[in-house]
Amino acid sequence: MIRSILFPTDFSAVANSAFPLAVALAAQFDAIVHSVHISHGGDPHITETSRYEFPGLPTGSSSVRVIEAIIPKGDEDPAQVIMRHAKDRVCDLIVMASHGRSDVAQFFLGRSVAEQVARDSKIPTIIARMYGPRRTTRPIDRFKRILYVTDLREESKHILKVAAAIADKTKAELETLCIFNEGDEEPADGGQATLDRFFAEAGAKCGKFRRLHGGVGEEVVEYAGRHKADLVAITTALGSGGDPKLTDTAEFILRNAPCPVLCMRPE
């Protein structure tokens, strides 16, 4: 399911702190990690001593294969380079932190770049918010509880196969949150039949699920924190009625979840 993982870094401690997550997943799936740095050319923060400081493998992960590469930015913005490089290397997953050096935040791993990748990438992407008052607070190299969030529309099922595969490999509990905005018509069975079909198509079995109503973005973030979720899985179309563009609900979850967020833009 996951054979190749792209890990972008600007060599900062914050960016590199997402590396254990990429390695942990690679170890579970026997996947290759492509650790890449996008060379800006004139970045004054990349000195001769720090230029090639890719993160080292965590203890106990020596069997994971890591391929390191420095690639030129060219005329593209960093998010486009990340997505193109992931496609060229046939990566199944992108793992990145949402912030690098504060004074060059808009250059590489700033919020705008991470959110652009999350918004536009059709390759599943895990974003770990590593700074600020709403930063990731749970350990990011282990999984005990994964939340799959769906509005029961077809677009929301596209991330389930990846979430279910991660849950299966890591032995994590996979819980489903069905969200209903004000005015949404709730199925008589609460969505059980639709969920059973989604899970069957993903080769998994639907277990525990809960329904949330109203301000669903806030409700999802609060639920994830209260129940100590290790990963939240969504698509950019969450709560949109089918439009694949990043919705306010998906954006709020990306910016405020207390754990990494697995997301993708549906086809």
Task: List PLM regions with ranges.
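Amphipathic coiled-coil/heptad-repeat helices and related helical stalk/stem segments
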Residues: 18, 78-79, 110, 159, ...
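Glycine/small-residue-rich hydrophobic helix-like segments
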Residues: 186-238
